Curated annotation (Swiss-Prot):
This is Orotate phosphoribosyltransferase. Orotate binds at residues 34-35, 127, 155. It comes from Janthinobacterium sp. (strain Marseille). The keyword Ribosomal protein does not apply. GO terms for biological process: 'de novo' pyrimidine nucleobase biosynthetic process; 'de novo' UMP biosynthetic process; pyrimidine ribonucleoside biosynthetic process. One of its GO terms (molecular function) is magnesium ion binding. One of its GO terms (cellular component) is cytoplasm. Gene3D superfamilies: 3.40.50.2020. Catalyzes the transfer of a ribosyl phosphate group from 5-phosphoribose 1-diphosphate to orotate, leading to the formation of orotidine monophosphate (OMP). Belongs to the purine/pyrimidine phosphoribosyltransferase family. PyrE subfamily. The keyword Glycosyltransferase applies. Keywords: Glycosyltransferase, Magnesium, Pyrimidine biosynthesis, Transferase. It catalyses: orotidine 5'-phosphate + diphosphate = orotate + 5-phospho-alpha-D-ribose 1-diphosphate.
């Protein structure tokens, strides 16, 4: 058991970011759980989340020079992770993009440090991979090298519509397409382990079978 990963799942449940019930995903699937990183919306919880990002990135052993946060959620995540890394003795620069180009002041769509060297893309989740693709294009256009993607939760489920499911997840497809690792703080296996270790009388324990069935239907190895 990776204690950091289990601590993250527990933290997400306690803050209401990870909820159990019946939810419809972007892909139209009925999921027994829902993860909404936008609910890390207080200073304390954001600081704790950034600690998880920073420590997981350090533990991964990935060599990198700076962070990039795609608009919009990635902006806060990359900024906070840079602060957490600095608190751990690793001072790195960060940048992010605007959705709309600015025609005054510094102009353009990029904000923050100049993109250079090996860049880690920081985001919350990967659904269709659109945000990653756009980030990779921007980083390469600046002459830098995207070296990894860091996300909070990997749902570990196959892409595509029912009846035409891919053999791979969106995370695996991103990794295969761009030849770089996608590192997550937690994933579906960690979530299931959390439910398996929950007391029989706990509120979460009753969702174990639903999550198992969902993983059986949509999960990847």
């Amino acid at each position: 058991m990776n204690n950091l990963r289990q601590e993250f799942i527990k933290f997400s449940v306690e803050t209401g970011v990870l909820r159990f019930g019946e939810f419809v995903t972007k892909a139209g699937r009925t999921s027994p759980y829902f993860f909404n990183a936008g609910l890390f919306n207080q200073g304390r919880t954001l600081a704790m989340l950034a600690e998880f990002y920073a420590q997981t990135l350090i533990d991964s052993g990935i060599e990198f020079d700076m962070l990039f946060g795609p608009a919009y959620k990635g902006i806060t995540l990359a900024s906070a992770t840079a602060v957490a890394l600095a608190n751990k003795g690793r001072d790195v620069s960060f940048a992010f993009n605007r959705k709309e180009a600015k025609d005054h002041g510094e102009g353009g769509t990029m904000v923050g440090a100049k993109l250079q060297g090996r860049v880690v893309i920081i985001d919350d989740v990967i659904s269709a991979g659109t945000s990653v693709r756009e980030s990779v294009d921007m980083i390469r256009a600046a002459g830098a090298t995207p070296c990894a993607v860091m996300i909070a939760l990997d749902r570990m489920e196959r892409s595509g519509a029912d009846g035409a499911l891919s053999a791979h997840s969106a995370v695996q497809e991103v990794s295969n397409t761009y030849g770089m690792p996608v590192v997550s703080i937690g994933n579906l296996s960690d979530l299931f382990e959390y439910l398996s270790n929950a007391g029989a009388d706990s509120e979460q324990a009753k969702y174990k079978e639903a999550v198992a069935a969902y993983r059986q239907r949509y999960g990847v190895a």
